[in-house]
């Protein structure tokens, strides 16, 4: 079956122009067929058939896939292919004309994108140069010291390091804002390519373009936006083709692999993508290429980490975070096989009287200090904490499931609460006042740790990146955030729409919607299973959940 692409005139016209310039007389027209009939009457039936085969082959090669709607048709228009010299003569003007037609065909979405860009400009004007979170200082320190972090993998510091010569936190904010816009464009482009009208392709892109929590993460020195961007663009590229070309498979694999070293929750996603592609019946060789490409950044980073700490890992804190996960329910009295050296991590308080899981990582009173003193992320402490957590899950599987389901309940709740337990607070809202960088105690650790000439002062400038609130832009964003955000319940509905589309296509293993939906579901479930709940973790699932719903 040959699909006819009527939704992407820019790509279609550019393909026509390139074919005009390079194909010459490769695709036969009526004149060529007539000449063949005059020279060789016996070939009158053969020449048109050969021309059709050449045309079909050319379409397939240009599409980069087998049987995919990859530009094989041209909107039902006849495709004349004049000689190469004639095509080259008017190429520049025709490129401009074709691009203009393409933009005109998508003007409605262009208006939406313009509003989204303007909104991000308001954020940048209202909070200059960028906003900070407690993790932000560590990312800056890692960027200037070139040492793998034990707590957080260094994929985001690599990004900051690439921008270090420009010494501009405003540029960091601008690039992250651009990533947010491009994610919305990617969702729209894939859905238009798959046949949705402009409004049907625009709706799934709206949460990415206008959700206030997305806007704030884009304006913070945090790894989340880079992680979401890499995963979203990689999956969108894989949904662009039925059979992704080798080049696309390599690029998508590298992006997914790099996302795993930006945030370690992305490590299982490579396996999720591979399984989803195989179920979608993508050529196994192309899936293998994607897998190998995805392993390159992961294995390379693990080797680099090993050169510093003597172990092959992405970080040294997975056991500690899993311990914080089980801290809300673990009771040593219900763990009869607990080793004596692990009992030091028991909390005698009843589960309903315990603090948030974050306290078991960062507080000075965490039981982890009994093992390692002030360094709760030492190799020994992480190993002991991880073993305790595994024993707790094995001994109390029902309690563990209840804890995970409770956090999932926060994910899909209608209202967002401001409490330490649910991981939502002033840090993830636009405020009328922001804490100056110089008043944050963590800064002193950064200044001590970053001893080389590219310290925080050099990266952020003389003001150390101290944020400034500017009116009336900040007031606009404070009012905006009260209305324009994606409620958790609506995210649940979006996931259900994607699931319904997959079930309806069960004979084809869910079709194209399976891949983005599976990755989105994994991003919703993995954080509550391995660490705890935070609203910023949920945002990673939104773009792909919307893409899956659109494809469904």
What are these language model-derived features?
Residues 1-120, 512, 552:
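Start-transfer (signal-anchor) and selected internal transmembrane alpha helices
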Residues 126-139, 147-167, 314-315, 381, ...:
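Extracytoplasmic catalytic/substrate-binding loops of multi-pass membrane glycan-assembly enzymes
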Residues 104-131, 210, 294-305:
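Transmembrane signal-anchor helices characteristic of membrane glycosylation enzymes that use polyprenol
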Residues 160-167, 172-186, 227-230, 487-498, ...:
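Transmembrane alpha-helices of multi-pass, membrane-embedded glycan-processing enzymes
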Residues 134, 171-181, 203-238, 246-247, ...:
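Multi-pass, polyprenyl lipid-linked donor-dependent membrane glycosyltransferases
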Residues 315-462:
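Membrane-proximal stem/loop segments at transmembrane-domain junctions that anchor or position
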Residues 117, 205, 249-263, 274, ...:
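Membrane-interface alpha helices of multi-pass inner-membrane proteins
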Residues 193-195, 234-249, 277, 281:
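Membrane-interface transmembrane helices that cradle and orient dolichyl/undecaprenyl
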């Amino acid at each position: 079956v040959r699909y006819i692409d009527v939704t992407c005139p820019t790509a279609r016209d550019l393909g026509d122009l390139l074919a005009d310039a390079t194909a010459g007389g490769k695709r036969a027209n009526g004149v060529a067929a007539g000449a063949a009939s005059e020279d060789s009457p016996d070939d009158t039936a053969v020449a048109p058939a050969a021309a059709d085969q050449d045309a079909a082959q050319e379409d397939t090669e240009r599409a980069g896939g087998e049987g995919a709607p990859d530009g094989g048709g041209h909107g039902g228009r006849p495709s004349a292919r004049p000689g190469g010299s004639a095509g080259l003569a008017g190429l520049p003007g025709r490129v401009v004309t074709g691009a203009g037609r393409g933009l005109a065909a998508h003007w409605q979405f262009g208006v939406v994108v313009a509003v989204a860009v303007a909104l991000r400009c308001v954020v940048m004007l209202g909070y200059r140069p960028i906003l900070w979170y407690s993790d932000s200082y560590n990312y800056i320190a890692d960027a200037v010291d070139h040492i793998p972090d034990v707590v957080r993998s260094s994929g985001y510091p690599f990004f900051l390091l690439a921008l270090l010569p420009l010494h501009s936190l405003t540029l960091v904010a601008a690039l992250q804002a651009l990533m947010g816009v491009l994610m919305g464009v990617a969702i729209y482009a894939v859905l238009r390519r798959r046949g949705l009208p402009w409004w049907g392709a625009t709706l799934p892109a709206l949460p990415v373009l206008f959700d206030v929590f997305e806007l704030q993460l884009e304006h913070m020195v945090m790894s989340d936006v880079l992680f979401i961007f890499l995963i979203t663009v990689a999956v969108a590229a894989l949904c662009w083709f039925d059979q992704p070309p080798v080049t696309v498979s390599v690029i998508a694999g590298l992006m997914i692999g790099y996302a795993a070293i930006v945030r370690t929750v992305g490590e299982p996603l490579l396996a999720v993508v591979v399984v989803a592609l195989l179920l979608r019946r993508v050529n196994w060789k192309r899936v293998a290429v994607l897998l190998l490409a995805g392993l390159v950044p992961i294995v390379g980073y693990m080797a680099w980490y090993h050169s510093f700490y003597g172990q092959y890992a992405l970080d040294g804190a997975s056991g500690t975070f899993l311990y914080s996960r089980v801290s809300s329910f673990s009771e040593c009295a219900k763990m009869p096989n607990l080793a004596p050296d692990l009992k030091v991590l028991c909390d005698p308080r009843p589960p309903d009287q315990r603090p948030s899981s974050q306290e078991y990582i960062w507080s000075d009173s965490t039981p982890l200090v009994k093992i390692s003193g002030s360094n709760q992320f030492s190799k020994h402490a992480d190993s002991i904490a991880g073993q305790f957590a595994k024993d707790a899950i094995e001994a109390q599987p029902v309690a563990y499931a209840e804890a995970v389901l409770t956090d999932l309940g926060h994910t899909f709740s209608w209202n967002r609460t401001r409490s330490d337990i649910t991981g939502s607070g002033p840090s993830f809202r636009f405020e009328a006042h922001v804490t100056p960088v110089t008043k944050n105690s963590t800064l002193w650790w950064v200044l001590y740790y970053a001893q080389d000439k590219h310290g925080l002062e050099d990266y952020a400038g003389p003001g150390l990146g101290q944020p400034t609130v500017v009116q009336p832009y900040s007031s606009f964003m404070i009012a905006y955030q009260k209305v324009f955000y994606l409620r958790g319940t609506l995210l649940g509905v979006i996931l259900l729409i994607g699931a319904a589309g997959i079930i309806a296509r069960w004979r084809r293993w869910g079709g194209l919607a399976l891949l983005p939906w599976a990755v989105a579901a994994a991003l919703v479930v993995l954080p509550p299973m391995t660490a705890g709940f935070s609203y910023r973790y949920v945002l990673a699932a939104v773009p792909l959940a919307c893409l899956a719903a659109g494809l469904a």
